[in-house]
Structure formats: C-alpha cells, structure tokens
From Swiss-Prot:
It is found in: Membrane. It comes from Neurospora crassa (strain ATCC 24698 / 74-OR23-1A / CBS 708.71 / DSM 1257 / FGSC 987). Induction: Expression is induced in the presence of quinic acid. The quinic acid (qa) gene cluster is subject to two levels of gene control: a primary system which responds to the presence of quinic acid via the qa-1S repressor protein that blocks the qa-1F activator, and a secondary system which represses transcription of qa genes in the presence of a preferred carbon source such as glucose. Residues 48-74, 120-131, 182-195, 307-327, 374-389, 457-458 are extracellular. MFS-type transporter; part of the qa gene cluster that mediates the catabolism of quinic acid (QA) and as such, allows the use of QA as a sole carbon source. Involved in the upatke of QA. The qa cluster encodes 3 inducible enymes (qa-2, qa-3 and qa-4) catalyzing the first three reactions in the catabolism of quinic acid to protocatechuic acid (also known as 3,4-Dihydroxybenzoic acid). InterPro entries: MFS_dom, MFS_sugar_transport-like, MFS_Sugar_Transporters, MFS_trans_sf, Sugar/inositol_transpt, Sugar_transporter_CS. The gene is qa-y. Disruption phenotype: Impairs growth on quinic acid as a sole carbon source and leads to very low inducible levels of qa-2 and qa-3 enzyme activities. This is MFS-type transporter qa-x.
C-alpha cells in the first residue's frame, strides 16, 4: 500500500480526484485558519509586556487577573457556541456558500472592533465585545466548512479533504503561536506591539470572504432544494466528468434515493429535522457527536492553546521569550503531524484506531508530567533565569510526545466523523449540535483553566490523563469506523452490531451489491438513468 493509496467504495474515474475539489476545500478552510489563529494568539498576547502594561495587569490580585484573562478568552467560545446554532438557520435558508460569506463578515467586524481598545478611555471592553462577534463568526464557520467539504468530497478522500480544514486550523495556530514571539523579540513594548497580533485576524477572514464568491454551492444542498439543473452543473464541474458518465449517473441516483428516503421518513422543512430527534437512532448520533468533542477537550488541548504561558510555567519554564519560543515549537510539531494525519492516517489507518492510539499515548504523557510537577514543584522557582533540571527537560519531552500522540488523532478526527455521520436531512442540525458541543466544552476549559491551575496544580494533568483513558472505553464500545463508507450508507453503518465489526460488514455488503454479476443484471437500469439524466440537462 502506497502512501496516498485510496480505498474506494466503487470504481472511480481518476478525473474525480482533481484540483477543483481540493481548491474548494482549501478556500473554505480559510475559515479554520481564522479559528486556529484566534485560538493560538490570544494566550501569548495576554502575556505581552506591552499588553499587560497598557491595561495595568499589575494592579490586579492573582484571582482577579485570572478572572479577567479567562473572561477575555472565554467570551470568544461563548460567541462561537451561538454561532453554531445560527449556522443551522443560515445553512437551511442561504446554503453553505452564502453562510460562509455572512460569517466571514461578522468575524471581520468583530476583529475591527478589537483594534479600538486602549488603556485609557475605551479600556479593554472593545476586545471583549469584538471577541464575542469573532466567536459568532468562527462558530458558524466551524459548523459550515466540514459539511460543505464532506458534501463535495468523493468517499475515498473525504477524510483527507475534511482534513484540509484541520490543516488550516494548524496553519492559523502556527502563525498565532509564533507572532507574539516575533513582536516580543523585535519590537519595543508599545501599543503597536500588541495591536499587530489583533490586526492579523483580518487576513484569513478577508481571504475567506473573497474566496467564497468563487467556490460553488454544495450540489447536495442544491438537489435538496430542487435546483437540479444548477446541481448537475456543479457536480459535473467538481467531478470533472460529463453528465452522462456512469459515475455521475450513479452519484445522482444515490443522492436522489437518499433524499427520497428521508423525505419519507423525516420530511422536508426547517423544523422537520427537530421532529426527527424523537427517533432514538438520531438522538444516539447527536449524543456521539457531542461526546467526541467532550473527550477532545478533555485531553487538555485547549488549556494549552489558550494558556500556554501558564502551562509551561507550571513545568518550570520562565521568561517571556522562552515561554513564547516553547509555545511556537508546540505549533510547529502540531503542524507537521497534522500533515502526516491528513495524507496518510485518517483515510488509511481509520478513525477508531488512531483515536485509541492517541488517547492511550497521550494519557501516559500527562501522568508523567503531573507526577514530575508533584514531586519537583518547579513552579515554586520564580527566578526569570532559572534553568531546567533534568526532570524538567524530561517533562518538556513528554509534553511534545503528548502533542505527537494527540495531534494526528483527537485534533481533527472528531470533525471528520461529525461531518460524515449524519444523514442529509439532519446533517446541518447534527453538525450544528456537534460544533456547539465543541465550543461549549471549549468555553468550560477556557473559562476555568486559570482557576484550575491555582487550585489543583499538578492535579490538572492527572485530571486530563484520566479523561483520555475513559475515552478509549467509550470509542471501543460505541463508535463504529466510518472510513470509506458513502454518506448515503451511514444509516446502515450505525444499525450494525457490534460496532467493532460494523465497517467491515457493511463494506462487504456494498461490494456484494456492486459485484460483476449484479452489475450485469442492473445494466438496463443504468441505461434508463443515463436517459433520464440526459433529459434533465
């Protein structure tokens, strides 16, 4: 098996894997660059000497300062939570593409408002207000982009294409982690020093806004809304095939069958998917989607993203430049491992297996770091020039090892699974629910991490280590492997028990349905579909 080998659900023309589908995914993923940058830059910006001086952080007690910092960080997640819910409405009425335009505009307005903050008259309030709006923008985008990409993607590369969304997150995070190291080492601690990191937010948002005018609407959304002629044109453009090509004919028939089934079972309309929540199978998938983000945030990732100076100080790293440098290296490691996950792991190794490995390895690393802090108490050394002990160096090694386990597993895989596990009629609502869960747990972590470090110290690491172990049990018993399964077959996947064998059994069913003998018997049906397609266009 080669590095980029693909496991196809049916014979697929090479033309399907073309630059158009990758380019559309990349443009939509400017949204994740926004999210990654905002998640990464804020923690180190709050530690910039120019920022702490302008807003007089020295006048606060430790508890009051922790509360202020957590509020600045967490209002963004609160806005994102509601942005996810708003996205369900915009997705239904406006479509995927126009929703991306709308949420990029909201983000741009929020980022611009933040630039009005100062240490005198306006104070820090514009930053808080702007981060609420920016949060609404990224919350909506975090809902929309995985859906949009999954609906464009051929099944064999769906994980890889949704993974571009995760790659964009890491590119934004990499810039966010390093930018404050750059301004801190090259600029005087003036107002301009901290304004630059806030202003950079406008770049990915502007690129998403402009790019969204070029990318097409999701063909699945167009079919669901009765715009068949436009949908056919978009689908043929994305697949780089003619309307009469057998692959296009089959894909249209799959989409039509899926829409017909859910029109019959759930019904069309804005409120109909809410009524489908009465069904146990739908409730179960919503629960699974939300729990994936509970376990993801339970790994400790967002405590590190938002409060990296605090995290590294607890290990024994002192000095602003050193803390920023260590944070920047953390961003580089995440970026490299995300590329490995994107190109190989997610579509070849599968979703379940990499979640197992990531949780087990990450938990061991957290146990070691917590034990080191309990025994050595490195945080008690307040000297700026304090050197790391051999135990501290080992703790740093295990921190980066934890990053190596977490990044190619829990970082992006929950987004991939949630983008593909819901049916057409509940996909927007399901993704909204999953993304809202992500931002809810994100909010909890960002709001209480400073207080947790004050009260629990080393216990914070034991807490995250325990949650990672529990996630293994949950995934093993409750989550089926979704790799290579067509979106139209997801319902069947979640019906098969036990979940450990569901993917294997369903792929065998799909291959049986499409074996040569059955293909011959269905050839007349395909000819009829070709004729119908020709008439449609």
């Amino acid at each position: 098996m080669t590095l980029l080998a693909l496991k196809e659900d049916r014979p697929t023309p090479k033309a399907v894997y073309n630059w158009r589908v990758y380019t559309c995914a990349a443009i939509a993923s400017f949204a994740s660059c926004m999210i990654g940058y905002d998640s990464a830059f804020i923690g180190t910006t709050l530690a910039l000497p120019s920022f702490t001086k302008e807003f007089d952080f020295a006048s606060y007690t430790p508890g009051a300062l922790a509360l202020l910092q957590s509020n600045i960080v967490s209002v963004y997640q609160a806005g994102a939570f509601f942005g996810c819910l708003f996205a369900y409405a915009t997705s239904y009425f406006l479509g995927r593409r126009k929703s991306l335009i709308a949420f990029s505009v909201v983000f741009i307005i929020g980022a611009a408002i933040m630039l009005a903050a100062d240490g005198q008259g306006r104070g820090i309030d514009p930053i808080i207000a702007g981060r609420v709006l920016a949060g609404i923008g990224v919350g909506g985008a975090s809902n929309m982009v995985p859906i949009y990409i999954s609906e464009l993607a051929p099944p064999a590369v769906r994980g890889r294409l949704v993974g571009i969304y995760e790659l964009g997150w890491q590119i934004g995070g990499l810039v966010g982690f390093w930018i404050n190291y750059g301004v801190n080492t090259t600029m005087a601690p003036t107002r301009s020093q901290w304004l630059i990191p806030f202003a950079v937010q406008l770049i990915p948002a502007g690129l998403l806004f402009l790019g969204s005018f070029w990318i097409p609407e999701s063909p699945r959304w167009l079919y669901a809304n009765g715009k068949r002629e436009e949908a056919m044109k978009v689908l043929c453009w994305i697949r780089n095939l003619e309307p009469t090509d057998r692959y296009i004919v089959q894909e249209v028939s799959f989409i039509d069958a899926d829409l017909e089934r859910y029109t019959r079972q759930v019904g069309n309309g804005f409120w109909k998917p809410f009524l489908s929540l009465k069904q146990r199978k739908v409730q179960w998938r919503f629960f699974l989607g939300g729990m994936l983000f509970f376990w993801q945030n339970g790994s400790g990732i967002n405590a590190i993203n938002y409060y990296s100076p605090t995290v590294f100080r607890s290990i024994g790293i002192t000095g602003t430049d050193t803390g920023f440098l260590t944070t920047g290296i953390f961003g580089v490691v995440k970026m490299v491992l995300t590329i490995i996950w994107l190109l190989w792991l997610v579509d070849l190794v599968g979703r379940r297996r990499i979640l197992f490995i990531g949780a087990a390895g990450g938990s061991l690393c957290m146990w070691f770091i917590g034990a080191y802090i309990k025994i050595a108490d490195p945080g008690s050394n307040k000297a700026e020039d304090a050197k790391l002990t051999s135990g501290g160096i080992a703790a740093i090694f295990f921190f980066y090892l934890w990053t190596a386990f977490y990044t190619p597993s829990w970082n992006g895989t929950p987004w991939v699974i949630n983008s593909e596990m819901f049916d057409q009629n509940t996909r927007s609502l399901g993704q909204a629910s999953a993304a809202a869960n992500n931002w809810f747990w994100n909010f909890i972590i960002s709001r209480f991490t400073p207080q947790m470090f004050i009260k629990m110290e080393y216990g914070v690491y034991f807490f995250f280590a325990s949650l990672m172990l529990l996630s293994i049990v949950f995934i093993y018993f409750f989550l089926p492997e979704t790799k290579s399964i067509p979106l139209e077959a997801m319902d069947r996947l979640f019906e098969i028990k036990p979940v450990q064998n569901a993917n294997k059994n369903l792929m065998a069913e799909l291959n049986f349905d499409r074996n040569p003998e059955r293909e011959e018997s269905s050839s007349l049906d395909d000819k009829d579909r070709v004729t119908q397609t020709e008439n449609a266009v």
